UniProtKB/Swiss-Prot annotation:
Pfam families: 14-3-3 (PF00244). This is 14-3-3 protein homolog 2. Disulfide bonds: none annotated. Belongs to the 14-3-3 family. It comes from Schistosoma mansoni. SMART domains: 14_3_3. SUPFAM superfamilies: 14-3-3 protein. InterPro entries: 14-3-3, 14-3-3_CS, 14-3-3_dom_sf, 14-3-3_domain.
Length: 214
């Protein structure tokens, strides 16, 4: 059938996968930092490495499953600007999660895919959605995290986040009653990241992972 998912179904799908992949991303970060601290004990380092690779495989499998769903079914069937942006953002997110664990040529490839999906989503969002729309704001939030964390481009990250925040502030009167809470929450997260990034002196990043949207 040609039926698109409803908003609620779309959100449930997104949250379900976000929880599954989120657990792996957290584990991967923890085990990677443990691995770095075990230099000097070959046995411990090997155990950490084996476990990291196991988590990596699970994380990659989940991401590829989501990306297949998006490319084969969800994106081709999306008819509204809202659903197109939602799914393209999701595609950018899952390639970004792959980029977090990938290395070498593979990393370059997934970074390009992530950036392309975010850019495509951003073009549609800017032309067809209010700056206060939670999906447009969530996209700006995650795209700016991509610039900061994956491309190591803090200036671009801050510019994108600030622009999205300022554009939303300028049109606060367009805030939809139904999505008021979502929109203002994401605006707060954009501000939090800007504060974090403009004060970041390159200390211990683990404690200061930026905020993301589902």
């Amino acid at each position: 059938s040609n039926n698109e998912l409803t908003n609620e179904e779309r959100n449930l799908l997104s949250v379900a996968y976000k929880n599954v992949v989120g657990a792996r991303r957290s584990s991967w970060r923890v085990i990677s930092s443990i691995e770095q601290k075990t230099e000097g004990s070959e046995r411990k380092q090997q155990m950490a490495k084996d476990y990291r690779e196991k988590i990596e495989k699970e994380l990659k499998d989940i991401c590829h499953e989501v990306l297949t769903l998006l490319d084969k079914f969800l994106i081709p069937k999306a008819t509204t600007a809202e659903s197109k942006v939602f799914y393209l953002k999701m595609k950018g997110d899952y390639y970004r999660y792959l980029a977090e664990v990938a290395t070498g040529d593979e990393r370059q490839k997934v970074i390009e895919e992530s950036q392309r999906a975010y850019n495509d989503a951003f073009d549609i969002a800017k032309n067809q959605m209010q700056p206060t729309h939670p999906i447009r704001l969530g996209l700006a939030l995650n795209f700016s995290v991509f610039y900061y964390e994956i491309l190591n481009a803090p200036d671009r990250a801050c510019h994108l986040a600030k622009q999205a925040f300022d554009d939303a502030i300028a049109e606060l009167d367009t805030l939809n009653e139904d999505s008021y809470k979502d929109s203002t929450l994401i605006m707060q997260l954009l501000r939090d990241n800007l504060t974090l990034w403009t004060s970041d002196t390159g200390g211990d990043d683990d404690a200061n992972a930026p905020d993301e949207h589902q």
